[in-house]
Amino acid sequence: MSGTLLAFDFGTKSIGVAIGQRVTATARPLTAIKAQNGNPDWTLIEKLLKEWQPDDVIVGLPLNMDGTEQPLTARARTFANRLHGRFGIKVTLHDERLSTVEARAGLFERGGFRALNKGSVDSASAVVILESYFEQHG
């Protein structure tokens, strides 16, 4: 086991991607994947899985602030199930509340408004999701 994890921040138009290492508990963004109504280009995801060979995949689970599910929650679960079904990899859902807010703040701090494009925010959110996962699961 390499200790490599791949994280996705599911969205209907763009899916953020991050790669991380369990040993160092660090993550970095990769290029976001465009999606059409929540359907990604599965060949790009297959390419990522072959290139990085993660032990696990983490998918952000969008929840309301009170912990209840929202319309996007079921779609993120479906995405996670499809990842597992297509590629046979272990997929873990992880609470992503406030990940986009934190990602936007970090990007703005480093690059102002110019840094706040959709793809960079989505992949930065995937980094936040993965770092949060590391904090909770080591």
Swiss-Prot record:
<keyword id="KW-0690">Ribosome biogenesis</keyword>
<dbReference type="GO" id="GO:0004518">
    <property type="term" value="F:nuclease activity"/>
</dbReference>
<dbReference type="InterPro" id="IPR012337">
    <property type="entry name" value="RNaseH-like_sf"/>
</dbReference>
<dbReference type="GO" id="GO:0005829">
    <property type="term" value="C:cytosol"/>
</dbReference>
<keyword id="KW-0378">Hydrolase</keyword>
<dbReference type="InterPro" id="IPR006641">
    <property type="entry name" value="YqgF/RNaseH-like_dom"/>
</dbReference>
<dbReference type="InterPro" id="IPR037027">
    <property type="entry name" value="YqgF/RNaseH-like_dom_sf"/>
</dbReference>
<comment type="function">
    <text>Could be a nuclease involved in processing of the 5'-end of pre-16S rRNA.</text>
</comment>
<comment type="similarity">
    <text>Belongs to the YqgF nuclease family.</text>
</comment>
<keyword id="KW-0540">Nuclease</keyword>
<keyword id="KW-0963">Cytoplasm</keyword>
<dbReference type="Pfam" id="PF03652">
    <property type="entry name" value="RuvX"/>
</dbReference>
<dbReference type="GO" id="GO:0000967">
    <property type="term" value="P:rRNA 5'-end processing"/>
</dbReference>
<dbReference type="InterPro" id="IPR005227">
    <property type="entry name" value="YqgF"/>
</dbReference>
<protein>
    <recommendedName>
        <fullName>Putative pre-16S rRNA nuclease</fullName>
        <ecNumber>3.1.-.-</ecNumber>
    </recommendedName>
</protein>
